[in-house]
Amino acid sequence: MSTHNDSAPTSRRRHIVRLVVFAGFLVGMFYLVAATDVIDVAAVRGAVSATGPAAPLTYVVVSAVLGALFVPGPILAASSGLLFGPLVGVFVTLGATVGTAVVASLVGRRAGRASARALLGGERADRTDALIERCGLWAVVGQRFVPGISDAFASYAFGTFGVPLWQMAVGAFIGSAPRAFAYTALGAAIGDRSPLLASCAIAVWCVTAIIGAFAARHGYRQWRAHARGDGADGGVEDPDREVGAR
């Protein structure tokens, strides 16, 4: 009996340690890549340009991997605009964005899904899965509109909680479209020295940021209302149980 009771906390600690190690690895990689500029994006652009007609497809693959390694998305999108112009560049950026979301989600699912389910417990994990099945797509879309949140970090987290890959891909495509245009067009405007294109890019970015701020506020209010509702339900006594006790 005591052996069984001791094994549960030990198993729980193991899952906690696994998630903490995974999160620490991501934070370390983020600092190494995003803060120290260990990857030379200009050199990457040069290498991609050397591939000739295959450059757009090459950049989609390379940029997807670099995005999962926390190279800032705006830099990758602007580089796409510099290389391919505003039209082709937007589709290249979107392809790379979807690739990053899928790669990061797969890694997050592999590294943390089992531990997250174990810590949630069977019943709560099933409820979470049902909620994700209904709302996962729009959670991914909404996250992409909220400014200041790393898309790669969010994709790793979504994978840990088991968001299906199709929801990650479609949600990333829909939610990233405005910012993909903004950053890609800005990069193309810098290359072409086009004030009009730069103004359009900045306008789209501002509108997206405002929508994202309102979406984050609305989502937070809904979460608080849901949490209060759960607390109120938890505090209601069962009348049948009370009668039985008497």
Swiss-Prot record:
Keywords, comma-separated and alphabetical: Acetylation, Cell membrane, Membrane, Transmembrane, Transmembrane helix
Keyword Cell inner membrane: no
Entry's Gene Ontology cellular component terms: plasma membrane
Membrane topology: Multi-pass membrane protein
Transmembrane stretches, start-end: 19-39, 57-77, 83-103, 157-177, 196-216
Residue ranges that the Swiss-Prot or TrEMBL entry lists as coiled coil: none
Locations listed in the record: Cell membrane
Keyword Translocase: no
Source superkingdom: Bacteria
Main subcellular location of this protein, as a coarse class: membrane
PTM annotation (N-acetylserine): residues: 2
Family in the record: Belongs to the TVP38/TMEM64 family.
Protein name: TVP38/TMEM64 family membrane protein Rv0625c
Species assigned in the record: Mycobacterium tuberculosis (strain ATCC 25618 / H37Rv)
Lineage: Bacteria, Bacillati, Actinomycetota, Actinomycetes, Mycobacteriales
